[in-house]
Design a protein with these regions (language model features):
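Bacterial Sec-dependent N-terminal signal peptides
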Residues: 1-21
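Histidine- and/or cysteine-centered catalytic micro-motif in compact active-site loops
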Residues: 3, 97, 137-140
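Short, aromatic- and cysteine-enriched interfacial helices/patches
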Residues: 7, 15, 151-154, 211
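C-terminal/domain-edge helix-coil "capping" segments
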Residues: 19-49, 85, 126, 137-148, ...
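N-terminal segment of the mature soluble domain
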Residues: 44-46, 50-134, 173-184, 204, ...
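Short, P/G- and charge-enriched loop/turn segments at secondary-structure junctions
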Residues: 120-122, 152-157
Length: 213
């Protein structure tokens, strides 16, 4: 019986494999105290599929899929921070709505999916915030606008093991300093929507991020 229990535990561990790395600046507390507002930018999202799966999609469709996923994740992260603000566990006064963030960027002629030519300080000045959250995200299971369903139906990956890698930066806009870097790699269930995904990504690490308590 113990043998089967051990085998089951090993299989479960393999199916839900995750790797987490967290960097926190040595003066993070000082940065947090000086932070009154933050904005979440769309992450640079890459949808990674096997060659035989790619044949059912054009390059343009893959790009659109990634852009839709980026905006969904942006909204889900905003919801995550807003929930913590309502609970009183967020140490930042204001979280800028994604619609406002994206509108300001567009009005300034900035592509919301391509802003790497600008420094965090420049983005902070344009958006009027003390902290920006940005980064990259790779997934084998897009969830936005039915993309996951389309991928399962067209590419036949409904039963495939899902994988995702998030690399998220919390950058102070006054001096371009990286205050927090959060890296997480997941292999297993990613949930059924972007809010599930963000909850999975942020699980167990929220209390270790200095902007939350």
């Amino acid at each position: 019986m113990k043998f089967y229990t051990l085998i089951f535990s090993l299989l479960f561990s393999l199916l839900s494999f995750s790797q987490t790395k967290l960097y926190v600046h040595e003066d993070a507390d000082s940065y947090v105290k000086a932070t009154k507002s933050l904005a979440i930018l769309p992450l640079d999202v890459q949808v990674k599929m096997r060659p035989k799966q790619l044949k059912d999609f054009t390059p343009e469709q893959i790009i659109v899929m990634g852009h839709n996923e980026a905006k969904d994740i942006q909204r889900a992260m905003y919801s995550w921070f807003l929930t913590r603000k309502k609970r009183g566990s967020l140490l930042v006064e204001s979280v800028q709505r994604p619609t406002v963030t994206n509108a300001i960027l567009k009005k300034n002629g900035i592509d919301i999916h391509s802003y790497s030519d600008l420094t965090p300080s420049e983005l902070g000045e344009i958006l009027g915030v003390d902290l920006i959250i940005t980064g990259t995200f790779e997934t084998s299971k897009p969830m936005s606008d039915g993309a996951g369903v389309a991928l399962a139906l067209l590419a036949g990956v409904g039963g495939a093991t899902s994988q995702a890698t998030a690399n998220i930066d919390f950058i102070n806009t006054s001096d371009n300093e990286l205050v927090v870097n959060y890296f997480k790699k997941i292999k297993g269930s990613l949930g059924s929507n972007s809010e599930d995904l963000i909850n999975i990504l942020m699980r167990k690490v929220s209390r270790r991020i200095p902007y939350t308590k």
